[in-house]
């Protein structure tokens, strides 16, 4: 072979190597997980656990203690913890690691994300066989810890982890959204906080709060800054409003119904109250708790898992304490369209187990994941925020009931706002719902929130939000999130943005081909 052809062949080989590394969004073609007859304790196992904490050192300590206690029970299983503060970063890193065959063993995640992970062949282990195993399943005879039996799992929470005919996760914690209300300001405006907030009430009070003094300060707080109604997660806002209105969002099979007339009406209402200064969002203005605690917000909607940041006496604050304003805080369900039939979202982290070539490694991973359902872990972690344990075993335990009974005893572990947020979900679990999970549901959720964000931004920029604007916005969201490619039944469309590593490898591939072409052209001219 002539020298130029040898060099070209080497460059081509490099290209093919790069192509192999990029994969097809990580389709490694693992064999389906098969449950071993028993756990091989003669071996050592090293498993990785990717977890999220809410910038809360108590949560980190619980993860570390859980690992230490589990390893004491199973000396041959070593758990390596990697902490994140953002679910989106976990999602992106998992996608990247699917492409390179280096996923973690156990991961805190959301079902919407798992639906995308499943586009890799047998990438996530289905858990039904593990649930039912007599030795190592729920309440298994060979387990060295006291975990929940199958009937002690809260059915609704467990069902949230099932899609495509199988369970691909177990619930870890559950929360919902709550409206944290500055009762002092509501009453100063001449209103009383009802037991169940309605959207009409919140909009009316928020508009009343925009009144100003002659010097430009707001009458209700005497400050230059006030956002009466501030929403943290606008995807949840849109989803819950559609559910309360009985309007479409998506079907279980993945048919998208978001872009309807009810959505159009919601966005026009958002524009109306944004224009008056009564409404804004976290992405645009900032963290609701900061505004609430500074006396610059009246209705702050955030997760019950953020309750320790809410209120004048909150144990966690993200502003200078001298900026705190004293007021009475009330915790309520999110605003409702029909107070007699409330609807609110169920959310919170779940745990999935990734498939591996070695079934014993998967079983070891499952045993650790299931350990996170023990009372010791469930109760301890639930106490860090307004979370609720996902097992009846933990919820009904004397330790957890004692914790709930001590509401307001102090402003740390028993902070009143936090416990009221937990009780809100415990009392209204039957009023919660989840959206359908399919490949593309994560993108649909993002689009739902972005509709509100872009409408709010446009209004603040003095744009007119009319039907023509909304038609254009619908088209933009469909294109941006590739919603026209999401197929009913959860096909291969909409795998989310390609990870940066894969983009880099594809760039290398293109550069290598270009070098081949340039080299061959140079060689041809040289020989002439």
Where would I find each of the regions flagged by the language model?
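C-terminal motif of bacterial Sec signal peptides marking the signal peptidase cleavage site
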Residues: 22-23
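Hinge/lid segment of periplasmic solute-binding proteins
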Residues: 39, 111-176, 218-219, 320-335
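Early extracytoplasmic/lumenal segment of secretory-pathway proteins
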Residues: 44-49, 53-115, 290
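Extracytoplasmic/periplasmic solute-binding protein
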Residues: 159-172, 177, 200-256, 297
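Glycine-centered hinge/linker elements that transmit conformational signals in sensory
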Residues: 205-207, 252-283, 329-330, 334
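Extracytoplasmic/periplasmic substrate-recognition and gating elements
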Residues: 272-274, 278-279, 315-394
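Long, aromatic- and glycine/proline-rich binding clefts that accommodate carbohydrate-like moieties
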Residues: 329-336, 382-456
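Conserved C-terminal helix/tail region of periplasmic/extracytoplasmic solute-binding proteins
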Residues: 416-528
């Amino acid at each position: 072979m002539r020298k130029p052809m040898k060099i070209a062949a080497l460059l081509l080989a490099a290209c093919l190597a790069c192509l192999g590394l990029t994969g097809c969004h990580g389709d490694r073609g693992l064999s389906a997980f098969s449950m071993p007859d028993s756990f091989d304790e003669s071996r050592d196992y090293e498993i990785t656990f990717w977890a999220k904490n809410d910038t809360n050192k108590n949560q980190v300590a619980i993860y570390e203690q859980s690992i230490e206690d589990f390893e004491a029970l199973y000396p041959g299983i070593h758990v390596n913890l990697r902490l994140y503060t953002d679910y989106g970063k976990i999602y992106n890193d998992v996608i990247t690691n699917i492409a390179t065959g280096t996923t973690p063993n156990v991961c805190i995640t959301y079902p919407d994300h798992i639906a995308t992970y499943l586009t890799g062949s047998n990438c996530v282990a289905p858990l039904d066989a593990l649930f039912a195993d007599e030795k190592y399943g729920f309440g298994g005879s060979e387990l060295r810890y006291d975990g929940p039996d199958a009937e002690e799992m809260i059915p609704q929470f467990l069902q949230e982890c099932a899609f495509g005919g199988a369970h691909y996760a177990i619930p870890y914690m559950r929360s919902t959204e709550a409206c944290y209300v500055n009762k002092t300001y509501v009453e100063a405006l001449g209103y009383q906080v009802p037991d169940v907030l309605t959207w009409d009430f919140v909009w009316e009070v928020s508009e009343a709060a925009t009144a100003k003094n002659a010097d430009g300060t707001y009458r209700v707080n005497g400050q230059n800054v006030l956002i009466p109604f501030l929403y943290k997660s606008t995807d949840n806002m849109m989803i819950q409003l559609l559910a309360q209105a009985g309007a479409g969002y998506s079907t279980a099979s993945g048919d998208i119904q978001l872009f309807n007339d009810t959505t159009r009406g919601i966005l026009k209402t958002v524009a109306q109250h944004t224009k008056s200064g009564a409404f804004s969002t976290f992405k645009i203005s900032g963290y609701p708790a900061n505004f609430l605690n500074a006396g610059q917000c009246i209705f702050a909607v955030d997760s019950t898992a953020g309750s320790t940041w809410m209120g004048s006496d909150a144990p966690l604050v993200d502003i200078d304490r001298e900026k705190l304003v004293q007021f009475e805080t009330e915790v309520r369900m999110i605003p409702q369209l029909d107070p007699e039939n409330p609807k609110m979202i169920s959310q919170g982290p779940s745990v999935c187990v990734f498939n591996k070539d070695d079934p014993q490694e998967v079983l070891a991973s499952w045993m650790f994941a299931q350990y996170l359902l023990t009372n010791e872990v469930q109760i301890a972690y639930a106490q860090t925020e307004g979370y609720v344990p996902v097992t009846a075993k933990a919820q009904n335990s004397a330790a957890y009931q004692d914790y709930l009974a001590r509401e307001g005893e102090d402003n740390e572990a028993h902070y009143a706002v936090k416990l009221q947020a937990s009780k809100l979900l415990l009392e209204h679990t039957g009023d919660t719902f989840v959206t359908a999970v399919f490949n593309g549901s994560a993108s649909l959720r993002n689009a739902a929130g972005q509709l509100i964000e872009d409408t709010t931004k446009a209004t603040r920029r003095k744009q007119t939000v009319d039907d023509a604007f909304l038609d254009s916005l619908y088209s933009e969201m469909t294109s941006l999130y590739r919603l026209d490619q999401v197929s009913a039944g959860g096909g291969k469309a909409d795998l989310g943005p390609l990870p940066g590593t894969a983009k880099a490898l594809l760039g290398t591939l293109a550069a290598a081909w270009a070098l081949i072409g340039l080299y061959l052209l140079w060689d041809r001219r040289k020989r002439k």
